[in-house]
Structure formats: C-alpha cells, structure tokens
C-alpha cells in the first residue's frame, strides 16, 4: 500500500491500538500523533468564529464553559443536559468497549469505584497502596495488584493520565506516589456527586493537559518537603517549573505557593499560574506570576 502519492492515516482510541501484530507490521514506518480534546485557545477560537455573543463573554466566562467539556463534539450542543448525556455515552463507551474487555474483569463495580476515586483525588499525590487500603477500610475486598491493573487499564484507555514524582535535586524519579488527571474535566460531572468542588485541582488538570499538548513530559516536583505542581521537561531535557493556584490575593497564600519554587536553585523558568486578575505579570525574584487563562492562550514555544 506504500505509494509516493499516498498518505495513510490510521486512527485509534486507546494505547492498545499500536500493540501486538499491528505494531510489528508498522514498525519504523509510522509517526504516532497523540490527539487530545480541544485546548482553551481552540475552544475560544471556535466561539469567535461561530458564536455571535462571544464579545459579551470574558475569558473567565469561556473558561467556565470550557470546563463543562472540551470534547469537540460538545461545541454543537445547545444545552448542558445534552452535553451531560454525551459525556455519559463517552464514558460508558470507553469503559465497556475498551477497559473492561481489555482487563477481562467481571468485577465492574470495583473498577468503577477505582475510576471514580481517581477522579475525586485529581491533583493529589496518591499511591496504589493507599488506594487499596482506602477501599479495604470501607469494606471493599481488593488487592494491590488488582488496583494496579485497573489503573493501568484506565490509563491505557486514555481516560486518565498520570504524573510521576520527580526529585529536582538529583533529577531522579520517585516511586512513592503519582498524580492522576482526567482527559476532560467535564467527565467529573458524571463521575462525582459534586463536580464543581475543588476548582483549584480542576485548573491544575487543565494546565497539565495543556503541557502535554505542548509536547512536554510532565512530572510532579519534589524539593525537600515541598511539592512543585509540575516539572515540564522538553525534548532537549530543559525544565520549566509551574505552581498552579486558584487565587493568591491573600499574602499568606501567595507566600505558600511561591515557597516551593523559591527552594529551587537552578536557573530554569519558574511560573506561578492563577486565576487572579489583579497583580498578574508580577515577578518575584525570577518567578513569573501569570493569569492562567492568559497562559493557556499564550503561543509559547517548547
């Protein structure tokens, strides 16, 4: 099928797609392009071109709409109920067509519990052992290996992504715990009783996906006892550090968010991203504070 005048595109919806026989046949002959839901910039551009009331909406208004779902198909939907129904269909399709057949599990209830638990702890470092102990203490019989297998299945289906911990001094990976993020924060609406709770971690989820979209490998940083939300590593092994907070107008909150970045001794770029509209573009001894929505719309290079 190889011809000079033919470009062949093969699409798939999970990480299993290029495994096994197909990968053997295509080895060395393909370029894999990872596609995520819409970025905030793409979402805004669509509304500029198609939504006549866009001029009346602030970036914050658009962000509220964006967090309902960033799947392209939802742009054509006229009600939140329609979007909700679509997200339910997407979630069910992923679980019953991708995850459950691949894991070959009959315990769908436990798998669902693990998925919902990961959604509820978005942005919080969590270990497999802690997840297992949480379920066991609530009366659910589940093993470490089962939890591990379920999480791997949820990640292979591209429903969840993870960020491992990275020790900044010494540049080594830590195996203790990871953070997990949903492919679309709108899925929280069908997985959790209060999807709008914890807006700070929802923002963190959005920033994580944008870093992946921009081509970075993303880790959670550790400096002594302090956590850095993201260490973004480019293809040349250059680092950029990010702290993400909903707001830092309170001096105590600002100091707390700056402290981990201040503990870093190297000269790589450091950013504090918030939804603050006052005091943006401040610089704290090399730590640049930016409005997170401006950063999402910022055409920066890797």
Predicted regions and their residues:
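Nucleic-acid nuclease catalytic cores
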Residues: 223, 265-284
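Active-site ExK catalytic segment of metal-dependent nucleases
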Residues: 240-249
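Active-site-adjacent loop/helix micro-motif of nuclease/hydrolase catalytic cores
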Residues: 248-259
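Domain-level recognition of nuclease-like catalytic cores that cleave nucleotide substrates
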Residues: 277-302
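Accessory nucleic acid-recognition modules appended to NTPase machines
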Residues: 79-238
């Amino acid at each position: 099928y190889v011809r000079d005048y033919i470009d062949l595109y093969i699409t798939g919806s999970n990480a299993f797609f290029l495994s096994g026989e197909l990968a053997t046949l295509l080895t060395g002959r393909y370029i894999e392009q990872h596609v995520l839901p819409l970025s905030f910039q793409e979402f805004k551009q669509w509304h500029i071109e198609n939504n006549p009331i866009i001029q009346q909406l602030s970036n914050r208004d658009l962000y509220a709409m964006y967090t309902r779902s960033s799947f392209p198909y939802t742009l054509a939907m006229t009600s939140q109920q329609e979007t909700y129904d679509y997200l339910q269909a997407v979630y069910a399709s992923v679980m019953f067509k991708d995850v459950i057949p691949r894991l070959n599990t009959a315990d769908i209830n436990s798998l669902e519990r693990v998925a919902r638990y990961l959604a509820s702890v978005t942005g919080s470092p969590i270990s497999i052992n802690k997840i297992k102990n949480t379920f066991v203490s609530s009366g659910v019989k589940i093993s470490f290996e089962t939890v591990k297998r379920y999480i791997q299945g949820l990640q292979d289906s591209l429903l969840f992504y993870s960020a491992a911990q990275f020790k900044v001094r010494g540049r080594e990976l830590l195996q203790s715990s990871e953070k997990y993020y949903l492919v679309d924060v709108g899925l929280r609406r069908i997985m959790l009783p209060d999807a709008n709770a914890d807006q700070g971690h929802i923002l963190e989820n959005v920033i994580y996906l944008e870093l992946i979209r921009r081509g970075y490998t993303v880790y959670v940083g550790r400096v002594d006892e302090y956590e850095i939300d993201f260490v973004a590593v480019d293809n040349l092994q250059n680092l950029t550090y990010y702290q993400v907070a909903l707001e830092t107008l309170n001096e105590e909150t600002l100091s707390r968010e700056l402290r981990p970045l201040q503990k870093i001794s190297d000269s790589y770029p450091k950013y504090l991203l918030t939804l603050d509209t006052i005091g943006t573009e401040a610089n704290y001894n090399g730590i640049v504070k930016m409005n997170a929505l401006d950063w999402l719309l910022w055409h920066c290079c890797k």
